[in-house]
């Protein structure tokens, strides 16, 4: 409480008109960090057991859970990246918010309730329940960590970008600060603590975008912009390449199906009391995301009219941070810029917290012994590894890097969960082969596109950057073909497990308890 009082005293003692944008932004960011710590500390008082740290003892109701899922899901890509891409690339970038939201419809239809009925704590837990294979569990563990850390790195880069924009400090300061705050919060209270934090941060992020959009739209009153026919006819504009439509379809596949494979999203469905609550949570999440994504879309359109495009070498992600000062200026512009900067920091904190919990949960149960102390040590590792990855690397556009994580998730856990839940014929060999093929193709293509971006002719270069159009069908096909070739390996227990996944109520008791791998 003393920190809150100190920040309040600074604000009360300072005339807003005499403050620059940097000072106001720093105050706003400090308030968000203090609020995050205070709410997290409240949650720590309720976190005692391993179940509290991993899944909040499965007691989170749909309303709270939906706000928390939305809070952690609306990452740097949603807050900064979407608006910047729409401002620069035009209407084709709308596939990002559409895909980010529509993925929850597929999650609701195919995965949410059965996944909760499985009784798992993590995706590797689900794999062990469904197939009873330690080998498959180990592959899932490696993929959870790969996706979580691939997703975490752009969050840290985004934090560095924000602090650099508002203070002029080096990027590494913001990267280190967010990594340490997130790790400390997760170590202290686990899932129980970050549920409250993420729910608060959803509503704060919504306000941090909605208020600037309304105020700037009212003040500037942008006029109607006439578009020529050719501007609408350039299908795939912004994606480039000789076959832009293929890249758009690839992005759609990655975002529509990738939600089903994101470990920090899936782990939140283990926190609900039952399968019905998981499905109700998904409906509410879809509504909350739809409401939020209206505002970065409108902001992108307004920025396209009011701001020049970024210069060569400058990321589109910084446009939203500069927008209030360019569009309005003065005290109002500084206040709005501070609000946007604070909302961006909230986005980094919420998403990073969920990713660290997901990675720590997997490491604590699969590598360590699953105790509270093990979770805390795993959280330290889960926070420091992406920090070590982020410091020496150069940030790409945040939405594009996050899109890479979606592509890997869509190529691995999406086919595993969909086929594992709805097809009894998926064998252990088929699941392992599909994960290796999907993960290998997507990770390999993305690595090549980042390391050697100019070494490939079109259309290959574009498809390497957006590999889901090839890697997702390949993963599904591999799982099906290998399973058909090894169908003699199916055991009678699969029927009992599938009944537990699909039949509500007492029939769930037939499911096996997840076995822990040998130490």
Regions found by a protein language model. Give the residues of each.
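Membrane-embedded helix-loop-helix hairpins and adjacent transmembrane boundary segments
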Residues: 2-519
């Amino acid at each position: 409480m003393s920190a809150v009082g100190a920040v309040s005293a600074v604000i009360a003692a300072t005339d807003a008109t005499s403050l620059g944008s940097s000072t106001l932004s720093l105050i706003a960011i400090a308030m968000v960090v203090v609020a995050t710590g205070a709410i997290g500390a409240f949650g720590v008082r309720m976190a005692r057991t391993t179940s509290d740290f991993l899944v909040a003892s499965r007691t989170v109701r749909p309303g709270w859970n939906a706000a928390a899922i939305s809070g952690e899901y609306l990452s740097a890509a949603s807050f900064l990246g979407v608006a910047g891409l729409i401002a620069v690339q035009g209407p084709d970038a709308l596939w990002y918010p559409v895909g980010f939201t529509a993925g929850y419809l597929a999650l609701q239809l195919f995965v949410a309730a059965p996944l909760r009925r499985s009784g798992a704590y993590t995706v590797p837990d689900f794999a062990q329940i469904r197939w009873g294979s330690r080998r498959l569990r180990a592959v899932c563990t490696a993929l959870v960590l790969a996706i979580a850390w691939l997703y975490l790195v752009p969050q840290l880069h985004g934090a560095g970008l924000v602090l650099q924009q508002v203070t002029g400090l080096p990027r590494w300061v913001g990267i280190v600060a967010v990594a340490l705050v997130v790790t400390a919060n997760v170590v202290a209270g686990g899932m129980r603590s970050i549920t409250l934090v993420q729910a608060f941060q959803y509503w704060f992020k919504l306000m941090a975008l909605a208020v600037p959009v309304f105020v700037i739209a009212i003040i500037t009153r942008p006029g109607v912009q006439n578009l020529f026919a050719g501007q609408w006819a350039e299908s795939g504009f912004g994606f480039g390449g000789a076959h832009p439509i293929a890249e758009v379809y690839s992005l759609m596949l990655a975002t529509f199906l990738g939600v089903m494979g994101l470990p920090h999203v899936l782990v939140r469905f283990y926190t609900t009391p039952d399968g019905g609550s998981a499905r109700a949570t998904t409906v509410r999440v879809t509504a909350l995301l739809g409401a939020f994504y209206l505002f970065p879309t409108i902001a992108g359109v307004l920025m396209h009219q009011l701001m020049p495009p970024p210069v060569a070498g400058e990321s589109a992600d910084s446009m939203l941070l500069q927008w209030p000062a360019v569009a309005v200026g003065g005290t109002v512009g500084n206040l709005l810029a501070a609000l946007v900067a604070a909302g961006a920091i909230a986005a980094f904190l919420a998403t990073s917290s969920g990713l660290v919990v997901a990675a720590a949960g997997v490491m604590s149960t699969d590598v360590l012994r699953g105790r509270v102390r093990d979770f805390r040590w795993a959280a330290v590792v889960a926070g420091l590894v992406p920090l070590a990855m982020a410091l020496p690397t150069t940030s790409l556009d945040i939405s594009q890097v996050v899109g890479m994580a979606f592509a890997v998730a869509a190529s691995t856990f999406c086919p595993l969960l969909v086929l594992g839940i709805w097809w009894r014929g998926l064998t252990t060999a088929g699941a392992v082969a599909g994960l290796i093929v999907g993960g290998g193709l997507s990770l390999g293509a993305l690595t090549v596109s980042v390391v050697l971006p100019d070494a490939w002719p079109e259309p290959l270069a574009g498809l390497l950057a957006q590999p889901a159009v090839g890697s997702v069908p390949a993963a599904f096909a591999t799982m099906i073909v290998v399973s058909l070739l090894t169908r003699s390996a199916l055991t009678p227990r699969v029927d009992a497990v599938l009944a537990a996944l699909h039949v509500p109520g007492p029939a769930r008791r037939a499911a096996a308890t997840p076995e822990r791998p040998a130490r």
